[in-house]
């Protein structure tokens, strides 16, 4: 069985139908709801039934996969629409990892959420077992019907966070289950690889209440004459919206009617024409937005050219562009410097923030294409422009940029570039001229500024305790080690050694504190070897 994350829509549905997983899942669901008088299944593990909630689960260790079945009592109609709001800062939120800067909170289906949290101890133990199973490369299927399927979905979301990227992800299969989250959760999951781990089997005669709760994952909608798989959540809503019967529905006959081949959406006569047209239009709009981004990327090259020209002009007057920009922010005098800040830098920041948002919004297969197309341009932008944002940040009297002030889009651009393992960037050829190099670590100047703040504390604080002084001095030594590492790797621009740079200001103060203690960096600086750094040999 392939990892569900590698499959889309109808492909996932076809795999599950032809593999017999639906019948296997449903038969085990029937067993947990109507247990036989005797069961000699050696691979069966049964949880103790929760007296307070009625939640139960069983583990079936089959030859080819492990199946976890959740069972829950029917929902009271009075509470079927209740929701629980979870915020990223809530201590009792078991899903803080789903929250983001754009979506700091979301709501869950209260009956399912209460059942899930009531069995936290048992489910934690189950998680440990399943992680070991996944490490053995045996697929894990998590399933349930009605409210049991809703709890299975919550459990799968919780389990997915702890699974290593190299392992197969579990597949969650639900049957006629209430939706578990609001529009915020839907938006969070459609941006995530987690979305491909859910297959919801629903009879076309079933009507699911969607006025507040919204669908995610893939839906296998079963008609009398066949079935279709749909990922488009708007189409799912149009086809299934209505009142939901919260009880357990027998899907045995539904599964028996399924053809062994999936109907393709384009050829299907089971879906109204207006729904199909809506799906096609939304797909077209996504592609149009995709194309516009590539066109805009070419426009951004003009602003990058201005910044590169600015960097070159600064170097001609023996000052790095970081320090020139910082000085002009404090004492603006040149119109060109002002334009760099207010027009070119701002335009580039807006564009790249939108790129990151678009990548995070897209399915993983599309996102990987987008990231590859934008990879090098985004990396050059980050290394060129983030130092200018850092200059603004510290001019406002702030500190610790890397941990408290860095924009999310810079973090993601750096992460994506690192994930690609670009061998070209691993090591600079010793014979190559580095005069135009952009420092690899775009937070370098933030590290310099923080070290200058530490030096100022050491020089100006009266009566400082010895332990505090030791901690601050250790920070300077750590920064020295960091600087020496990127120098030896040839990953830092020679501009840092210009006499008026903030780094040289740091060095002049640091060597007073360092005294006669020698190190690789002090020998490099004191003998002025830095003057030949980066020159072709």
Curated annotation (Swiss-Prot):
Changing residue 12 to A: No effect on interaction with EDS1. No effect on interaction with EDS1. Loss of interaction with EDS1. Pfam families: EDS1_EP, Lipase_3. It catalyses: a carboxylic ester + H2O = an alcohol + a carboxylate + H(+). GO terms for cellular component: cytoplasm; EDS1 disease-resistance complex; membrane; nucleus. Induction: Specifically induced during senescence via a complex epigenetic processe involving histone methylation. It comes from the Eukaryota. It is found in: Membrane; Nucleus; Cytoplasm. Acyl hydrolase that triggers the leaf senescence onset. Can use triolein as substrate to produce oleic acids. Involved in the EDS1-dependent intrinsic and indispensable resistance signaling pathway; together with PAD4, required for programmed cell death triggered by RPS4 in response to avirulent pathogens (e.g. P.syringae pv. tomato strain DC3000 and H.parasitica isolates CALA2 and EMWA1) and in restricting the growth of virulent pathogens (e.g. H.parasitica isolates NOCO2 and P.syringae pv. tomato strain DC3000 avrRps4). Contributes in reinforcing the immune response around hypersensitive response foci. Regulates the nuclear localization of EDS1. This is Senescence-associated carboxylesterase 101.
């Amino acid at each position: 069985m392939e990892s569900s994350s590698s499959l889309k829509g109808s492909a996932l549905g076809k795999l599950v139908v032809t593999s017999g997983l639906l019948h296997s899942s449903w038969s085990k669901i029937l067993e947990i709801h109507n247990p036989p008088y005797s069961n000699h299944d050696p691979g069966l593990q049964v949880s103790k039934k929760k007296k307070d909630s009625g939640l139960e689960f069983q583990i079936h260790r089959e030859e080819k996969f492990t199946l976890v079945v959740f069972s829950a009592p029917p929902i009271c109609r009075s509470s079927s629409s209740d929701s629980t709001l979870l915020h990223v800062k809530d201590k009792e939120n078991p899903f803080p990892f789903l929250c983001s800067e754009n979506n700091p909170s979301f709501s869950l289906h209260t009956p399912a959420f209460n059942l899930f949290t009531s069995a936290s101890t048992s489910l934690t133990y189950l998680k440990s077992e399943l992680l070991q199973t996944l490490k053995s490369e045996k697929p894990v299927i998590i399933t349930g019907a009605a409210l049991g399927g809703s709890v299975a979905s919550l459990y799968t979301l919780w389990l997915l966070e702890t699974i290593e990227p190299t392992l197969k992800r579990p597949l969650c299969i639900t049957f006629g289950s209430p939706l578990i989250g609001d529009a915020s959760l839907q938006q969070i999951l459609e941006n995530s690889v987690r979305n491909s781990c859910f297959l919801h089997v629903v009879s076309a005669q079933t009507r699911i209440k969607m006025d507040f709760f919204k669908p995610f994952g893939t839906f296998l909608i079963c008609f009398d004459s066949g079935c279709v798989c749909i990922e488009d959540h708007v189409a799912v809503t149009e086809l299934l919206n209505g009142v939901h019967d919260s009880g357990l529905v027998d899907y045995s006959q539904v599964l028996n009617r399924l053809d062994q081949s999936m109907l393709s959406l384009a050829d299907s006569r089971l879906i109204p024409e207006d729904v199909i047209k809506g799906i096609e239009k939304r797909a077209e709009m996504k592609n149009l937005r995709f194309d516009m981004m590539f066109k805009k990327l070419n426009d951004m090259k003009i602003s990058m050219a201005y910044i590169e020209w600015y960097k070159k002009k600064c170097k001609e007057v023996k000052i790095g562009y970081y320090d020139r920009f910082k000085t002009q922010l404090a004492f603006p005098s040149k119109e060109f410097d002002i334009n760099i800040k207010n027009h070119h830098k701002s335009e580039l920041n807006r564009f790249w923030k939108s790129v990151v948002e678009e990548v995070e919004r897209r399915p993983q297969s599309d996102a990987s294409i987008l990231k590859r197309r934008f990879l090098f341009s985004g990396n050059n932008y980050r290394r060129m422009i983030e130092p200018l944002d850092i200059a603004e940040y510290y001019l406002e009297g702030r500190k610790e940029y890397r941990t408290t002030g860095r924009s999310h889009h810079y973090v993601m651009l750096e992460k994506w570039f690192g994930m690609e393992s670009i061998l070209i960037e691993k090591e600079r050829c010793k014979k190559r001229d580095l005069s135009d190099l952009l420092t690899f670590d775009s937070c370098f100047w933030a590290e310099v500024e923080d070290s200058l703040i530490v030096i100022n504390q050491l020089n100006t604080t009266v009566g400082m305790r010895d332990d505090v002084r030791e901690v601050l001095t250790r920070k300077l030594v750590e920064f020295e080690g960091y600087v020496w590492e990127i120098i030896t790797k040839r990953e830092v621009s020679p501009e840092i050694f210009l006499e008026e740079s903030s780094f040289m200001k740091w060095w002049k103060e640091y060597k007073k504190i360092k005294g006669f203690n020698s190190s690789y960096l002090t020998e490099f600086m004191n003998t002025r070897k830095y003057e030949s750094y980066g020159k072709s040999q």
